[in-house]
C-alpha cells in the first residue's frame, strides 16, 4: 500500500520559544540585569523589548576589532501622546545625565532617550515610572502605544472621546503579570491613574474564546502576540494619525448632540516589509464595520484574539495581522471576529474625506485657553549652535508648567496656555532660534518625516534623520529652478524597509536599500489616503536631481489645476512617468540648450488645445507631439 507522506508540522519561530520560556516576560532579562556585562544576550534582548527598550550599537563610535558600543534606547508608552510637565522634566534630565543630550519624538507619539548604558537602565525606567510615565508595551509582540489626534479641543467632544478610548484600550491590552514592576521597581507597582471599572470588567469577560485559561495573562497568554500590534482612535476627517496604517483603527461616531454612539472599525493596515521579498508588503487597512460604544471592548478583544490565535507564529515576516487579512480576505476575517464577539458588525457609517492636519501655530482650545503647535524637524529635540530648541522647551515647561501632546508627525503641542502667556512663550522660543510661525517653515520640511536610522538603529542600512534635511533642501532648490517655488510635497524617509516613518503613504518616499541608496516610492496622497508604489529600486543619492527633474517638469506641464504631485503620479501612472523621463533632455546650465535639443514655439491657443488633449487622454504632451509629427512627416 502506497501512502502519501504528510507534511512535517511547521516549527514555531525562535522568538515564540523565547517568549514561552520567559515566565511572562521575566527571564533571562531579570537575571542578566544583575550581571556585570554591558549588554544582554539575544534571548534577553527579545524580552527587553516588551519593557520598552532596545539594545543598540552606536556605529559612529564602533572601533574596528573592538566590541560593539552597546547602549540602550528607552521609549515611552503614552496613549494619545500625553506627556505631563513632570514627566517631560524627568525625561529631559535623564537625557542630560544618562543619555545623548537629545530627546526624540516618535511617529507613534512617544518619546525616546538614546545612549543609556546597561548599568543605568533600571534607574532610568524607575525614574520614568515614578514621574507619571511608563515604557511597558512601547515595543515587542504586544499592543504598542495607542494613537489619537493630539489636538486638545475642549469644545469638540469627539476629540475627548478619542483621547479617552485611546487610554482605555491601552489599559485593556496592557500586560498583567507584574513582571515589569518586579524587575524595574523591585515589585512596587506605581499607578499614575486608576483604571476605569469597565476596562477591568472587559478584560475578565470571556466572550467566545477571547480569553485564555490563564489568570496571569487572560488576553495574551504566555506567548503574547505573533508580532507587534498597533491601534489608533481618531475622529471623522482627522487623519493626523495615518488611519490606514494600523492593525485596528477606531473612528469615533457621535450623534448631532455630540454624544458618543459607537465606532467605525478599520483593520489590517501595516507598512513593514523586506527588500527583495515580494511576499512581504505594505498594506492599507480595510473598513470592517461599525460597533456601538457598548461593544467596543468586545470588538477590540475579538480582533486581538483572531490575530493571537490565527496569526503566523512560524514566520515572523508573515506574522503581522495584515497578512492574515491578505490571506483570508476581509469577509472571512470579519466572520471570525464576529464569532469571537458574539454578534455581527453593523454597517460602516459614512465618513467625510480624510485630511492631514498638523496643528502647528496658535489655536483656541474652546475653553478660553490656547494650544501651540511646535514643528520639530525629524522629531529631534536638541541644542545645536544657535538653534536651542531643547533649552527653550525646558524653560517654557518649567516656567508655565504646561503639559505636552506629541503628534504622529513627531511634532509637539503645548496646551492649557493662558492667553496672557502667549507673547512670553513666543519670545522664549524666538530668543533660542526656534521658528514659531508655521508659515515661515518650508512645506517640504513641515510635512516631512524621517526615522532615526544611523548610527543607533540596528536595522538601518543607510542614513535617514541626518540626511533628510539636505535631501529636502536639494528638492526645494530643484523645484525653485523649475519655477515651482511654493510646491508642497509630503516626503518621508527611512533607513530600512520597516517603514517607521511611514514612507509608503507619502507622495515621495525614500526607503533605504543600500549605503547612500534608496528605493523611491511615488503616488501617495497629501492626506495619506492611499499607498504609494515603488518607482525605482535603488537611487544613489547623487542621482536625486537627475531622477526628479524630469518628473517635476512633467508634473508642471501636465498637472490638472492644483493637483498635488502625489495625485499626479497616481493619475498618469508609472509607465507615463518613465516614458517622459526617458525622452527628457535637461537644459544646459546658463539657460542654453544642449546641441541636440530644439525648440518649436506654439501659439497660446495651440498650447491650450495640446494641454487639454493631454489631460483628456492621460498622455504626455511631448508624446502627442511626437505622434503627430511622425504621422505628418510619414505622409
UniProtKB/Swiss-Prot annotation:
The keyword Metal-binding applies. It holds the Pfam family NIR_SIR_ferr. Keywords: 4Fe-4S, Heme, Iron, Iron-sulfur, Metal-binding, Oxidoreductase, Thioether bond. Binds 1 siroheme per subunit. The keyword Cell wall biogenesis/degradation does not apply. Its cofactor is siroheme; [4Fe-4S] cluster. InterPro entries: NiRdtase/SiRdtase_haem-b_fer (IPR005117), Nit/Sulf_reduc_fer-like_dom_sf (IPR036136), NO2/SO3_Rdtase_4Fe4S_dom (IPR006067), NO2/SO3_Rdtase_4Fe4S_prot (IPR045169), NO2/SO3_Rdtase_4Fe4S_sf (IPR045854), NO2/SO3_Rdtase_FeS/sirohaem_BS (IPR006066), SiR_ferredoxin-dep (IPR011787). It is an enzyme of class 1 (oxidoreductase). SUPFAM superfamilies: Nitrite and sulphite reductase 4Fe-4S domain-like, Nitrite/Sulfite reductase N-terminal domain-like. It comes from the Bacteria. [4Fe-4S] cluster binds at residues 451, 457, 496, 500. One of its GO terms (molecular function) is 4 iron, 4 sulfur cluster binding. It catalyses: hydrogen sulfide + 6 oxidized [2Fe-2S]-[ferredoxin] + 3 H2O = sulfite + 6 reduced [2Fe-2S]-[ferredoxin] + 7 H(+). There is a cross-link at residues 54-139 (3'-(S-cysteinyl)-tyrosine (Tyr-Cys)). One of its GO terms (biological process) is sulfate assimilation. Siroheme binds at residue 500. Its EC number is 1.8.7.1. Monomer. Catalyzes the reduction of sulfite to sulfide, a step in the biosynthesis of sulfur-containing amino acids and cofactors. Belongs to the nitrite and sulfite reductase 4Fe-4S domain family. This is Sulfite reductase [ferredoxin]. It comes from Synechocystis sp. (strain ATCC 27184 / PCC 6803 / Kazusa).
Amino acid at each position: 500500500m502506497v501512502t502519501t507522506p504528510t507534511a512535517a508540522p511547521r516549527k514555531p519561530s525562535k522568538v515564540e520559544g523565547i517568549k514561552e520560556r520567559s515566565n511572562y516576560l521575566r527571564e533571562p532579562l531579570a537575571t542578566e540585569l544583575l550581571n556585570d556585562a554591558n549588554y544582554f544576550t539575544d534571548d534577553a534582548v527579545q524580552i527587553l523589548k516588551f519593557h520598552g527598550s532596545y539594545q543598540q550599537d552606536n556605529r559612529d563610535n564602533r572601533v574596528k576589532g573592538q566590541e560593539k558600543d552597546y547602549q540602550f534606547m528607552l521609549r515611552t508608552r503614552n496613549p494619545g501622546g500625553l506627556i505631563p510637565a513632570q514627566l517631560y522634566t524627568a525625561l529631559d534630565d535623564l537625557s542630560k545625565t544618562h543619555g545623548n543630550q537629545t530627546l526624540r519624538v516618535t511617529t507613534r507619539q512617544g518619546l525616546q532617550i538614546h545612549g543609556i548604558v546597561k548599568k543605568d537602565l533600571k534607574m532610568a525606567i524607575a525614574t520614568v515610572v515614578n514621574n507619571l510615565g511608563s515604557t511597558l508595551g512601547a515595543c515587542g509582540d504586544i499592543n504598542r502605544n495607542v494613537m489619537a489626534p493630539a489636538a486638545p479641543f475642549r469644545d469638540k467632544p469627539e476629540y475627548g472621546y478619542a483621547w479617552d478610548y485611546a487610554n482605555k484600550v491601552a489599559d485593556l491590552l496592557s500586560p498583567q503579570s507584574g513582571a515589569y514592576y518586579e524587575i524595574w521597581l523591585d515589585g512596587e507597582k506605581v499607578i499614575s491613574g486608576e483604571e476605569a471599572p469597565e476596562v477591568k470588567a472587559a478584560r475578565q469577560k470571556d466572550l467566545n474564546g477571547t480569553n485564555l485559561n490563564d489568570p496571569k495573562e487572560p488576553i495574551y497568554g504566555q506567548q503574547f502576540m505573533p508580532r507587534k500590534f498597533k491601534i489608533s482612535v481618531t475622529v471623522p476627517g482627522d487623519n493626523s494619525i495615518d488611519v490606514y496604517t494600523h492593525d485596528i483603527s477606531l473612528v469615533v461616531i457621535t450623534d448631532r448632540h455630540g454624544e458618543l454612539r459607537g465606532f467605525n472599525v478599520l483593520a489590517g493596515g501595516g507598512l513593514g516589509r523586506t527588500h527583495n521579498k515580494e511576499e512581504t508588503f505594505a498594506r492599507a487597512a480595510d473598513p470592517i464595520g461599525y460597533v456601538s460604544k457598548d461593544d467596543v471592548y468586545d470588538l477590540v478583544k475579538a480582533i486581538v484574539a483572531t490575530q493571537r490565535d490565527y496569526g503566523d507564529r512560524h514566520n515572523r515576516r508573515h506574522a503581522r495581522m495584515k497578512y492574515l487579512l491578505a490571506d483570508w480576505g476581509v469577509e472571512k476575517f470579519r466572520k471570525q471576529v464576529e464569532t469571537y464577539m458574539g454578534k455581527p458588525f453593523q454597517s460602516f457609517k459614512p465618513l467625510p474625506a480624510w485630511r492631514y492636519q498638523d496643528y502647528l501655530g496658535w489655536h483656541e482650545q474652546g475653553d478660553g485657553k490656547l494650544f501651540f503647535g511646535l514643528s520639530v524637524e525629524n522629531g529631534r529635540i536638541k541644542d545645536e549652535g544657535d538653534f536651542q530648541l531643547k533649552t527653550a522647551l525646558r524653560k517654557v515647561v518649567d516656567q508655565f508648567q504646561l503639559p505636552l501632546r506629541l503628534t504622529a508627525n513627531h511634532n509637539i503641542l503645548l496646551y492649557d496656555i493662558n492667553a496672557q502667556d502667549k507673547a512670553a512663550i513666543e519670545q522664549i522660543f524666538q530668543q533660542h532660534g526656534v521658528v514659531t510661525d508655521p508659515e515661515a517653515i518650508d512645506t517640504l520640511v513641515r510635512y516631512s518625516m524621517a526615522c532615526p536610522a544611523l548610527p543607533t538603529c540596528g536595522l538601518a542600512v543607510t542614513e535617514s534623520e541626518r540626511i533628510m534635511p539636505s535631501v529636502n533642501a536639494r528638492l526645494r532648490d530643484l523645484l525653485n529652478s523649475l519655477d515651482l517655488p511654493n510646491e508642497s510635497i509630503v516626503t518621508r524617509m527611512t533607513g530600512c524597509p520597516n517603514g517607521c516613518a511611514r514612507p509608503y503613504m507619502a507622495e515621495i518616499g525614500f526607503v533605504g536599500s543600500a549605503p547612500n541608496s534608496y528605493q523611491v516610492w511615488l503616488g501617495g496622497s497629501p492626506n495619506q489616503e492611499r499607498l504609494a508604489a515603488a518607482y525605482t529600486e535603488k537611487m544613489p543619492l547623487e542621482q536625486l536631481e537627475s531622477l526628479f527633474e524630469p518628473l517635476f517638469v512633467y508634473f508642471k506641464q501636465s498637472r490638472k489645476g492644483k493637483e498635488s504631485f502625489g495625485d499626479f503620479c497616481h493619475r498618469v501612472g508609472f509607465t507615463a512617468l518613465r516614458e517622459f523621463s526617458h525622452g527628457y533632455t535637461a537644459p544646459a546650465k546658463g539657460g542654453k540648450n544642449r546641441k541636440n535639443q530644439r525648440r518649436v514655439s506654439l501659439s497660446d491657443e495651440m498650447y491650450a488645445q495640446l494641454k487639454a488633449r493631454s489631460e483628456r487622454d492621460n498622455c504626455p504632451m511631448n508624446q502627442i507631439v511626437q505622434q503627430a509629427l511622425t504621422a505628418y512627416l510619414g505622409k
